Regions:
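Nuclease catalytic cores that cleave nucleic-acid phosphodiester bonds
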Residues: 2-151
Length: 151
């Protein structure tokens, strides 16, 4: 089992690394050339800046049982199909039971933005420490669940 992070502008990278280190799990951070990262713990893979390049690379190296951290519903759907686990930076788990609904909502929101001529209907609120704690707790639970299933 490894942890793969869609690390372009991901606010929970340090939390992922800290928790993964506690469990001795390898972490791979994926970013494009516009968001070059460095890490003392994680492997960093930098891909070209093409549209969705990081997403495609992440999907290609993901395996059954891996844990993926991404805010992209499309990536989540693809890795779930490969038997991996996926979690949003909010701590929400993507599952086979909720991903279809999430993709439909994304589609409807995109249609609404097009119809209104707006690029975004609303911005996300500023991240607070409670958000980080919620992510950490949810991520920890996912790791334990994945480890139990590996046994």
């Amino acid at each position: 089992m490894q942890i793969l992070v869609d690390a372009d502008a991901c606010p929970v990278v340090s939390i992922v690394e800290r928790v993964a280190k506690e469990h001795n799990l390898p972490v791979t951070l994926l970013c494009d050339t516009n968001h070059v990262l460095s890490s003392d713990y994680s492997e960093v893979i930098v891909v070209g800046a093409g549209a969705d390049a990081v997403d495609y690379k992440l999907i290609s190296i993901c395996h059954k049982g891996d844990i993926i951290v991404s805010q992209d519903y499309g990536v989540a759907a693809m890795v779930l199909g490969k038997g991996a686990y996926a979690i949003h930076q909010s701590g929400k788990w993507y599952t086979n039971e909720n991903i279809d609904q999430m993709l439909m909502e994304r589609h409807l929101n995109k249609k609404a933005r097009r119809a209104s001529g707006k690029k975004h209907l609303r911005g996300s609120r500023k991240r607070i420490s409670e958000d980080d704690e919620h992510f950490r707790e949810s991520f920890e639970k996912m790791i334990h669940m994945a480890m139990d299933k590996e046994k």
